[in-house]
Amino acid sequence: MNKIQHISFITKKNPLVSYERVGALQNRFVQHYLNYKANKVEQPPKPTIITSQVCPVYTLGRRESSINFTKGFPKAKVVKALRGGQTTFHGPGQILAYPIIDLKSFGLSPREYVSRLEQAIIATCKSFGIEKAHTTKNTGVWVTENDKIAAIGIHLRRNITSHGLALNVSTDLKYFNYIVGCGLYGKNTTSFKDQGVFTDLKSVEKVLVNNLDSFLMSK
């Protein structure tokens, strides 16, 4: 049984949700943690993971003020995010996973936290036969030195995590052609489908959440 509470927006009836709606729920959980730390509420919050598949959107990192598309203007919204990192794309065929936990409770540094996110993603990829999944000097999970399958961008406030990871399962990769993903020139984005693995989001979501639970909840 998972130690972490899981809330999923990925359903057959409503497979897509707005990025803003996911963010609003995430902020509610973060605020609960902050209120608890400030002794404003007695009930401690539960460690939580929110997973979703959002409508097409480009998000800017907190240090960016605008986006420069490399060619034309794609049909997608542009939204400012609090996470670290630079511009990336979120949309159909991609799993967004936002863990909301107190790093201090688990004795994790921000660097160790990111490392555990990467380990959970790698374990998930390998469960579906993508054995080449690995880390490099650049944050995220890669299948070659130039092909990234998952991006990571986090935000911390009083050791409370928000935002998290984006894992490409069957994402339409053309959206990445309009940007320099995460500010990394000469790098590409790949997906399970692009790697010859054809599966559905719910199957990958289940394995990913179990792996995140295993890697994040162990002290």
Swiss-Prot record:
Species name: Schizosaccharomyces pombe (strain 972 / ATCC 24843)
UniProt keyword annotations, A-Z: Acyltransferase, Transferase
Name of the protein this chain belongs to: Probable octanoyltransferase
Lineage of producing organism: Eukaryota, Fungi, Dikarya, Ascomycota, Taphrinomycotina
Signal peptide: none
Active site: residue positions: 182 (acyl-thioester intermediate)
Family: Belongs to the LipB family.
EC number per UniProt: 2.3.1.181
A UniProt-annotated Pfam family: LplA-B_cat
GO CC terms, sorted: cytoplasm; mitochondrion
Binding site for substrate: 83-90, 151-153, 164-166
Keyword Phosphoprotein carried by entry: no
PROSITE patterns per the UniProt record, alphabetical: BPL_LPL_CATALYTIC, LIPB
Annotated site location: Lowers pKa of active site Cys: 148
Limits of the BPL/LPL catalytic domain: 43-219
Functional note: Catalyzes the transfer of endogenously produced octanoic acid from octanoyl-acyl-carrier-protein onto the lipoyl domains of lipoate-dependent enzymes. Lipoyl-ACP can also act as a substrate although octanoyl-ACP is likely to be the physiological substrate.
Example GO biological process: protein modification process
Catalysed reactions listed for this entry: octanoyl-[ACP] + L-lysyl-[protein] = N(6)-octanoyl-L-lysyl-[protein] + holo-[ACP] + H(+)
Remarks, miscellaneous: In the reaction, the free carboxyl group of octanoic acid is attached via an amide linkage to the epsilon-amino group of a specific lysine residue of lipoyl domains of lipoate-dependent enzymes.
Pathway: Protein modification; protein lipoylation via endogenous pathway; protein N(6)-(lipoyl)lysine from octanoyl-[acyl-carrier-protein]: step 1/2
GO molecular function list: lipoyl(octanoyl) transferase activity
